[in-house]
Swiss-Prot record:
Domain of life: Bacteria
NCBIfam families for the chain: bL25_bact_ctc, PRK05618.1-2, PRK05618.1-5, PRK05943.1
Protein's organism: Cupriavidus metallidurans (strain ATCC 43123 / DSM 2839 / NBRC 102507 / CH34)
One of the record's GO molecular function terms: structural constituent of ribosome
Family: Belongs to the bacterial ribosomal protein bL25 family. CTC subfamily.
Keyword field: Ribonucleoprotein, Ribosomal protein, RNA-binding, rRNA-binding
Any one Gene Ontology cellular component term annotated for this protein: cytosolic large ribosomal subunit
SUPFAM superfamilies: Ribosomal protein L25-like
Subunit structure: Part of the 50S ribosomal subunit; part of the 5S rRNA/L5/L18/L25 subcomplex. Contacts the 5S rRNA. Binds to the 5S rRNA independently of L5 and L18.
The protein's name in its UniProt record: Large ribosomal subunit protein bL25
Amino acid sequence: MKVVAFERSVQGTGASRRLRNSGKTPGIIYGGAAEPKMIELDHNALWHALKKEAFHSSILDLEVAGKSEKALLRAFQMHPFKPLVLHVDFQRVSATEKIHVKVPLHFMNQETAPGVKLGHGIVSHILNDLEVSCLPADLPEFIEVDLAAAELNQTIHLSDLKLPKGVTAITHGDENPAIASITLPAGAQSSEAAEGGEETPAA
C-alpha cells in the first residue's frame, strides 16, 4: 500500500494547527539508521486509509519527496470528538530485521461451526488480533481462525492456529492463550439437556 507524504520543516503547536487548518496532518517517520523525519500528509487520504484494516498491519510504501521507504504505521492520535487525525507515526523497517506487529484475526466458518449450528451456542472472540514476530516479507495481512469443527463449550487456543511460515506469536508469558470460545447464551440450556429433561408430576 502506497502512502504519499511531504517533508515538514516547521514544528511546534502553532505550525501544526496551521497545517491541520489547510487539510494536512503532521507526522513523523523514525527508526533505522536514518534520522527521524518530520512529514505531513493529506488529511482526507489518511482518514480513509485508517479505515482499512490492511493499513494498520501491512508494510507500507511511504513516499517522501519522491523517495520511497518501507514503513509500518505505529501510532495515530485522534481529536477527542471531531473526525480529525491530529498526528501520525511511522516506523522504518529493514528487510533483514524482524518486526513486532499486531495482526488481525479473521474468524472463519462461525455460522457453520457445530457448536453454533447444532448446539445453538454463540462465538466469543477473546482476542481480535495477535502480536507476531517475523521478517517484513513474511508479515501476513491477517491470520485465520477456522471454527469449522468447533463444538459447544470448546475454547480455541493459540496452539489450534496454523501460523504462516516464518511467523512466531508473541504471547507475553501466556504460552497458549485462548483465542475464542463457543458457549450457550446466558439462561439457555443445551439441546441435550432440553431433550433429557422430564416433567415433574404434580403433587
